[in-house]
Amino acid sequence: MLDILVIAPHPDDAELGAAGTILRFKDEGARVGVLDLTSGEPTPFGTPEKRAAETAAATAILGLDWRENLGLPNRSLEPTLEARRALAVVLRRVRPRWLFAPYWVDAHPDHVAATQLVEAARFWSKLTKTDMPGEPWHPQRIFYYYCVHLKQAAQPALVLDISPYWERKLAAIRCYHSQFIEGRPTTPPTFLDQLRDEAAYWGKVIGKAYGEPLASREPLGLASLRDLV
């Protein structure tokens, strides 16, 4: 049983948008998993073998308790009934308390489809009188992380302080050499420079060194305002 399940369209999306959150939860003793929906291949400089090795290296840095790939088609991901059932079965098996999915507005069709799929599968996972294996389960909440392909100003519901975890987040992202280093321009600002600037911006917003924005479709409750940074 997992406390947190981060669902990613491709291997590297969870690292880009939620690695700081993952590392913080792990540091607090939570059981955290990642489900990649597709292999992420083909890409210009990647291969299935290379991407799998990169994912394994990033997984080790994050210290994940569980990671699997659902094996859905890259570049043509759709929230079909078959895909919904497959994801709902996983949710009934690993029984996460909270889900993390990509932000719902994106230029990448796979990302948009992934979010629609997560929301539908979350509902299906609680169904009774079904031929799906496993006992019914309904994750309490969905948070949305930003790994978008749009130049837009994010409007998060909260920003998590990831200052102690930034360097490890960057190390996990660097594992995907075929995606973020190979074939990329080396003149500043590099892609990784831009990621650092973005995290620093969100850190500044909350008075910290680095931050990770998260969105929610539903209101968030606090036990006490003392929990605010």
Q: Which stretches of residues belong to each language-model region?
A:
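Active-site rim/loop-helix segments in enzyme catalytic domains that contact anionic ligands
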Residues: 1-94, 215, 227
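Metal-dependent de-N-acetylase/amidase catalytic core
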Residues: 1-7, 78-229
